[in-house]
Amino acid sequence: MTTTAPTTSGPARAPHDPAPHDPARVRDVVGVGIGPFNLGLAALSAPLDDVDAVFLDAASEFRWHPGMMIEGATIQVPFLADLVTMADPTSPYSFLAFLKATGRLYPFYIRESFYPLRAEYDAYCRWVAARLGSLRWSRRVIAVEHDPAADAFVVRAETLAPDGSVTGTEEHRGRHLVLGVGTSPVLPPALRALADEVARGEHPGAGPLVHSAQYLPHRDALAAAGSVTVVGSGQSAAEVYRDLLDGVHGDARRPGYRLDWVTRSPRFFPMEYTKLTLEMTSPEYTDHFHALPLELRQLLGREQRGLYKGISGDLVDEIYDALYRLSLDRPVPTTLLTDTEVVAARYEPAARGRGDTGAAGEPDAAGPAGEYVLRLRHAQLGREVERRTRALVVATGYAASVPAFLDPVRHLLRFDELGRFDVARDYTVDDARRVHVLNGEEHTHGITAPDLGFAAWRNAVVLRTVTGREVYPVEERIAFQTFGLPDDAGPATAPPPTASRTADAAASAAAAARAAGEAR
């Protein structure tokens, strides 16, 4: 008896490049970036005869957060939040179709968990990508221009060899441009300069100093360093800490090994899964948030990050249980510091003529030749201390930015006073409604921007704009609660002079900002 079935069902596998490139062809859509959001748009576009689309990415193939593909880790949304189901439950590109095609539908059913493994979600996306003919890999977009005569965008891309060298250039023309370029890792200011110094090789023999996005390639070196400090408070920080705490890659019982966790969050906040809170990932709340003044959106945005960047409650419990188990025979060499910010950092090489020692004072000849010295400030106490560590994992999140390749068309785009995209409710950033942004609109649309569960709905809105018709039903109301005031609440009145909503919101947001799931 076999445990897996051959891959026979599902949409046929697409060729890598189904047709010769025609630079004069004007498509309906040119997408830049092939992460889950643009991949979902490609899948929803595939069956549409009136949408001619192509999607470009510099990568050679689909890979979703490869640096955090930790064994056993799950995604934090149910399997229904796949690439297509929330827009088209009958799509052949659904997660359930993938499970059926790969012989894993019944095992998944018996497993009785709504949350797929992270590696499983990556395999699903790769399965979908292999079956779409609209994807062009190894294309690095270098410039976007506008051709008024053709009323189309001209997307210039370098073609890349497997080693990353440039082999040529291409032009792709499209009436609509969809930006799905994702976000980039962010380091706190106190660590940026030091990380750059290490990357430039200015500290020979220094231990790893990496963002969590690059955790797996450095995991063995981190575990071998002798002492590791994790900075951050969200799911990524928790997963790295748990992975290094004990087991194959880290062992808190090993002589000289030390693992610390530092966050400026007041506590290790779990992600909130209560149902009325989840209604904030709805079209109605997105409408409400988008209509608020910029200043209030700024405050609410900082406050609400903890709603989707917290830690899985199960993982919090698992970490505690591991610490409890490890502490049975002796204290665990670990320190968990909350409400504590890294305000400065430097590297100190080992003193000449003496062997380096680990954070716990044990000799460790195999470890790095020096230590990182972190200056930490405790917010409540107002005091600063220094802590030493041989390696650092910085799990402080990601941020969106405006790609440089848009410089030739910046005059066509809208920006707010902080230089960010001024994204309309329909996800466009130009007055002609031709340039669409996916996951670059958290400051205008709130917490639905990075949400995998809302991506299919957003893509249905994009396709409605592209085609001029509602290809997939776009729900307008799904929530039981009302955000703002009901329509029959009577005429609006100003708050009394003594009530300062902005001041109250600012105070609330200041406290909540430290609780943000990916806070430094």
Where are these regions (language model features)?
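Flavin (primarily FAD) cofactor-binding/catalytic cores of flavoenzymes
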Residues: 2-60, 108-235, 239-497, 517-520
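Non-catalytic nucleic-acid substrate-recognition regions in nucleic-acid-modifying enzymes
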Residues: 60-61, 80
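Tryptophan-centered motif/residue detector
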Residues: 64, 95-98, 127, 457
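Glycine-rich phosphate-binding loop and adjoining beta1-alpha1-beta2 segment
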Residues: 65-78
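Short, solvent-exposed beta-strand-terminating loops
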Residues: 77-81, 85-93, 268-271
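A conserved beta-strand/loop capping segment in the N-terminal third of enzymes
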Residues: 86-121
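Long, low-complexity, intrinsically disordered segments
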Residues: 501-520
